[in-house]
Amino acid sequence: MAMKIRLARGGSKKRPFYRIVAADSRMPRDGRFIEKLGTYNPLLPKDSEERVKMDVERVQYWLSQGAQTTDRVARMLEAAGVVGKTERSNPNKAVPGKKAKERAEEKAAKAAAATEAAAEE
């Protein structure tokens, strides 16, 4: 079985509430799960103790059994100090795109033309 530790949505429309569950990855998002590991209520303030609750011991058990976490649950576990922070490396993100380079070149050309015109006068 491909196990995942993920969020299962509950609550009503515009009032989300999530359960942190260990589930087979092939099961529906809100469907059958193996064990409930905690809860997440995004409507509460970020500094609230009740916002994220989880059974850390059981989470560590499922991680030791080979369960993979989703991105959002991994961030919650990092914040709780259960797992180490994963390094995210995307060196191309800071490189400007084609259009940005073209705009910068046009701006530099206009600035150079303006300084030449000012120097001639």
UniProtKB/Swiss-Prot annotation:
Annotated region described as Disordered, given as residue ranges: 84-121
Originating gene: rpsP
UniProt KW keywords: Ribonucleoprotein, Ribosomal protein
Similarity annotation: Belongs to the bacterial ribosomal protein bS16 family.
Compositionally biased spans, kind Low complexity: 110-121
Gene Ontology BP annotations: translation
GO cellular component: cytoplasm; small ribosomal subunit
SUPFAM superfamilies referenced in this protein's UniProt entry, alphabetically: Ribosomal protein S16
Keyword Ribosomal protein: yes
Protein name per Swiss-Prot or TrEMBL: Small ribosomal subunit protein bS16
Lineage: Bacteria, Pseudomonadati, Pseudomonadota, Alphaproteobacteria, Rhodobacterales
InterPro entries: Ribosomal_bS16, Ribosomal_bS16_dom_sf
Any one GO MF annotation of this record: structural constituent of ribosome
